[in-house]
């Protein structure tokens, strides 16, 4: 192993999703050398969420202590081309049939374009993003007292490492294995479908038997299209997740165009 084959950077970020790109942009704006490693060939593809994105007003309405962070506010200045449908209202339906209505300051967006937009901002700020580069393992260099990152496209060291790989915490798993103290096991699998049909104007959430120990959602993306999905804790659902979603969409007379999915961490 030659030291010449190892590339050193100040900060390496694993994952070019919204968190990774935002962190990279902020660091680059401060003049810090930052490299983002993304395992996929296209940022944001495939999408792994319901595609509801909050505006700044919704963020500070929920997290009031963030209001004075002007630099953070800039991250929520989105161009109109990312906004497919404005979400001004939300409804939550309980198993009893009772519902609650809330005002909302958000929009339905296209995650592929949204993630690409954030990655472009990070690169314009001076960050470097390398695609199709997956982290394979971490090796401790005892003499140098640092970790060696072994990837599909080379080896790296860094002063600081940021794990922005998503809810399954790829870096944490490589470093700590199945240690429950650093990797909670309670991960909720989710599945969604892009659908066509008579969809509501509001962002609707359903609790109860439709998604045991979880929730289902309908996020309208325009007059006839929506992102419909559900997340259920493992072991709480009879049958497979995809079949359950198909029945949910059939009950709503919605035509399924495509499927996607992801994970939601519970408890940490």
Predicted features by range, described:
Residues 19, 42, 168:
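Conserved Rossmann-like nucleotide-cofactor binding loop
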Residues 11, 32-34, 161, 203:
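Hydrophobic anchor at the start of a short beta-strand
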Residues 40-90:
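N-terminal FAD cofactor-binding segment of flavoenzymes
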Residues 255-268:
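Flavin (FAD/FMN) cofactor-binding core of flavoprotein oxidoreductases
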Residues 16, 123-255:
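Predominantly flavin-linked oxidoreductase catalytic cores and closely associated redox partners
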Residues 101-121, 170, 233-241:
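Short beta-strand to alpha-helix junction loop
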Residues 3-19, 35:
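Beta1/beta-strand and adjacent pyrophosphate-binding region of the FAD-binding site
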Residues 16, 28-49:
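Glycine-rich FAD pyrophosphate-binding loop
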């Amino acid at each position: 192993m030659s030291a010449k084959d190892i590339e050193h950077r100040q900060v390496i970020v694993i994952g070019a999703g919204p968190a990774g790109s935002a962190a990279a942009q902020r660091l680059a704006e401060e003049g810090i050398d930052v490299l983002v490693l993304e395992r996929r060939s296209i940022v944001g593809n495939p999408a792994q969420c319901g595609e509801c994105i909050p505006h700044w007003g919704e963020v500070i309405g929920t997290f009031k202590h963030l209001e004075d962070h002007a630099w953070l506010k800039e991250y929520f200045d989105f161009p109109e081309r990312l906004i497919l449908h404005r979400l001004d209202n939300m409804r939550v339906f309980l198993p009893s049939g009772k519902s609650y209505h809330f005002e909302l300051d958000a929009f339905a967006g296209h995650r592929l374009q949204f993630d690409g937009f954030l990655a472009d901002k990070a690169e314009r700020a001076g960050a470097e993003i390398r695609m199709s580069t997956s982290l394979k393992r971490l090796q401790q260099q005892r003499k140098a007292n640092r970790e060696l990152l072994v990837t599909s496209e080379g080896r790296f060291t860094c002063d600081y490492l940021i794990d922005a790989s998503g809810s399954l915490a790829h870096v944490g798993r490589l470093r700590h294995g199945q240690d429950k103290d650093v990797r909670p096991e309670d991960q909720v699998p989710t599945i969604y479908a892009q659908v066509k049909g008579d969809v509501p104007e509001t962002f609707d959430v359903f609790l109860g038997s439709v998604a045991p120990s979880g929730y289902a959602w309908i996020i309208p993306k325009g007059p006839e299209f929506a992102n419909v999905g559900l997340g259920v804790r493992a072991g709480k659902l009879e049958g497979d997740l995809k079949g359950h979603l198909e029945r949910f969409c059939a009950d709503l007379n919605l035509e399924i165009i495509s499927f996607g999915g992801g994970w939601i961490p519970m408890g940490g």
